[in-house]
Amino acid sequence: IQDVHLIDKMAHFDRERIPERVVHAKGAGAHGYFEVYRCMEEYTCADFLQVPKAKIPVFVRFSTVIGSKGSADTVRDPRGFAVKFYTSEGNYDIVGNDIPVFFIRDSIKFPDVIHSLKPSPDTNLKDVSRFWDFISNSPEAMHMITWLYSDRGTIKSYRHIDGFGVNTYVWVNSRGKRRYVKYHWKTMQGVETIDRHEAEILAGLDPDIAVRDLHEAIECGKYPKYELYVQLMDIEEAENLPFNPLDDTKTWPEDRFPLKRVGMMTLNKNPENFFAEVEQSAFCPANIVRGIEFSDDKMLQGRIFSYSDTQRYRLGINFTQLPINKAKCPVDNNNQDGLMRYDYKKGSVNYKPNSLNGNKPIEAPEERVECVYVEGNITKESIKKTDDFTQAGERYRGLNENEKTALIDNILSELWQVPEKIQRKLIEHFTRCDEEFGDRIAEGLNLKSKKSINKYKFK
């Protein structure tokens, strides 16, 4: 026991691991920059979007969602697409996915959808019946299913995926004009997917293929590029739409709300240390800057708390002081102490208001925000405009025949393992999306009649 070098070495080794992310555990990261195409002052006073050709440092983390850190990159899953902008007024995080919609529209169901996708608590084995049971009782997920179970749900390269903010934010210009905004990243390498069979093979042969592909491409100078587009909507328009634009299970029609190009992101530097820069990177939808606000998007409102809270659990209360998360602009507040605090404020005044320190810190200036009139009783209620099936049906009918067949085959490859009562409920949902869609699922499960099914033998 007197060999203090041994004790110190072993003690450090025993504590090398930190809690794994509950979702998005397996990931890859890269540094780069974002170059603004044109001044966006008409729409937002966000400082980093005002000067054409300005280059803003960024860090990006791509990830799978459900699997643990040792899982395969090619499994059917949404992919996380999180971007941290190190702006002159603080960090701004766009924390999105490679699919424009999500399973649910209310954050209170988020733990439930994740629980249904994770291994069963009694056996720790993945059971697709649990997920499809949840989906059969959550028809708002139909639109997401048409994306996830197409070949967009299986990829082998993060360089060849698009990204979407999913949530709706608010942009505010210097005159106080507020607009809803949705973010779109479009890969300049072209979207590439793989089918289920190749995904299953690669999961065994090269489970880290997407992480490796990104690292090797940057290492040899093939820098991935992604263009940022936004859709903008006057807040007054929301009431006249047949759906709620703050519903994360919906997309905005591009013919009515066209995409506007904002700039281009280039990833040109690999992390020097994976743990320090990728594992300890912390993205939070709550990280916004002047000129950008939160909407009443129910999923966003839940994420504002949850993401910051999970980082405090994983990394400690002072996670924003870690180099990868630290803002590149000056930060001044009265936060103090806590585990692993190393950046500190000099002097004796750590409160406000005060006279001894000139009433500092001074709050960052905000642009004038137009008055928003609110009246009525506060209540807990669901989104009223649901329409769970129209956009899912439009998505299905927009696929070509090969894409439809792949979607059907991918769904059936799991549904044959599901109890018949859940199958029948899902067929009803698919039929409400599109009659052909429902018929093909029913045919694959031999459920045209009420006889006992023959298990679907997928290709």
Predicted regions span which residues?
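Active-site-adjacent core segments of small-molecule enzymes
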Residues: 1-459
